[in-house]
């Protein structure tokens, strides 16, 4: 799933470490999400959106897997 996490984080002037601490996750988790190698849990996705004051769909872009009906 694509996301705008890096863009939002950098706009706030935050490091990956600072964001990780604020969200209660590791820096490696932030790196993996930003690179699209890890899709966060729904709970974490909502925490990220809430942290930045945006809607979840403003952070995460669902591209679909071609199996939608």
Regions found by a protein language model. Give the residues of each.
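DNA major-groove recognition helix of helix-turn-helix/homeodomain DNA-binding modules
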Residues: 43-58
